[in-house]
C-alpha cells in the first residue's frame, strides 16, 4: 500500500499567517508564541510569518476569508480561546466560529488549522496554552505545516 503524508520540514519560503483572536489574550498570546515557535523550529523564516489580530473568535472566519482571498499566503493557522460562561453565548460563538472556519477552508482548498480552544474553564485554557496539555498553538502550526506539505505531494 502506498502512503502519502505530509512532513514537518519547511523550506523557508512558505508564507503562513496566524489569525489570533485577542479576546482572552492572556491565553491566546501563549498560543501565538507556541505557533511561532513551531514555525521557526521547523525551518520557517520569520519574515514569512504574519500575525493577523481580530477582536474575538467570531471574527476569525471573516479575517480568514480576506487572508485567503488575498492569495498572499500558503496556509493559515487560526488560534483563539472561547471559555464557557454562565450564558449560551459560548455555544453560539464556538459553533459559528467552527463552521465559519470550515466553510472558508473548503472554499479556498488551502491548508488551515483550527487552534481555537473551546473550554469549560480558564484552568482548562491555561493547561492547553503551554501547561499540562501542551501548547495547542504549537500543535495547530505543526498541523498546518504537515497539511501544506501533504497538499504539495497531492498536487494541490
Swiss-Prot record:
Name of a matching Pfam family: DMRL_synthase
Keywords carried by this UniProt record: Riboflavin biosynthesis, Transferase
Any one Gene Ontology molecular-function term assigned to this protein's record: 6,7-dimethyl-8-ribityllumazine synthase activity
One Gene Ontology CC term in the entry: riboflavin synthase complex
Residues at the catalytic site: 89 (proton donor)
Known EC number: 2.5.1.78
InterPro entries in alphabetical order: LS, LS/RS, LS/RS_sf
Pathway(s) the chain acts in: Cofactor biosynthesis; riboflavin biosynthesis; riboflavin from 2-hydroxy-3-oxobutyl phosphate and 5-amino-6-(D-ribitylamino)uracil: step 1/2
Biological process according to GO: riboflavin biosynthetic process
Residues that, per the record, bind 5-amino-6-(D-ribitylamino)uracil: 23, 57-59, 81-83, 114
Entries under CDD domains matching the protein: Lumazine_synthase-I
Residues given in the record as (2S)-2-hydroxy-3-oxobutyl phosphate binding sites: 86-87, 128
Top-level taxon of origin: Bacteria
Reactions mediated catalytically: (2S)-2-hydroxy-3-oxobutyl phosphate + 5-amino-6-(D-ribitylamino)uracil = 6,7-dimethyl-8-(1-D-ribityl)lumazine + phosphate + 2 H2O + H(+)
Function: Catalyzes the formation of 6,7-dimethyl-8-ribityllumazine by condensation of 5-amino-6-(D-ribitylamino)uracil with 3,4-dihydroxy-2-butanone 4-phosphate. This is the penultimate step in the biosynthesis of riboflavin.
UniProt-listed NCBIfam families: lumazine-synth
Family stated for the protein in its record: Belongs to the DMRL synthase family.
Name of the protein described by the UniProt record: 6,7-dimethyl-8-ribityllumazine synthase
Amino acid at each position: 500500500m502506498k502512503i502519502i503524508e505530509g512532513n514537518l520540514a519547511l523550506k523557508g519560503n512558505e508564507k503562513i499567517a496566524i489569525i489570533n483572536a485577542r479576546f482572552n489574550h492572556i491565553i491566546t498570546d501563549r498560543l501565538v508564541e507556541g505557533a511561532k515557535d513551531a514555525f521557526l523550529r521547523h525551518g520557517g523564516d520569520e519574515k514569512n510569518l504574519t500575525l493577523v489580530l481580530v477582536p474575538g473568535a467570531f471574527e476569525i472566519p471573516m479575517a480568514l476569508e480576506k487572508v485567503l482571498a488575498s492569495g498572499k499566503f500558503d496556509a493559515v493557522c487560526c488560534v483563539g480561546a472561547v471559555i464557557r460562561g454562565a450564558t449560551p453565548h459560548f455555544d453560539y460563538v464556538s459553533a459559528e466560529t467552527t463552521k465559519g472556519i470550515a466553510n472558508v477552508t473548503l472554499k479556498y482548498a488551502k491548508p488551515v488549522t483550527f487552534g481555537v480552544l473551546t473550554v469549560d474553564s480558564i484552568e482548562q485554557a491555561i493547561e492547553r496554552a503551554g501547561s499540562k496539555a501542551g501548547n495547542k498553538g504549537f500543535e495547530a502550526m505543526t498541523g498546518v505545516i504537515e497539511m501544506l506539505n501533504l497538499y504539495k505531494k497531492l498536487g494541490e
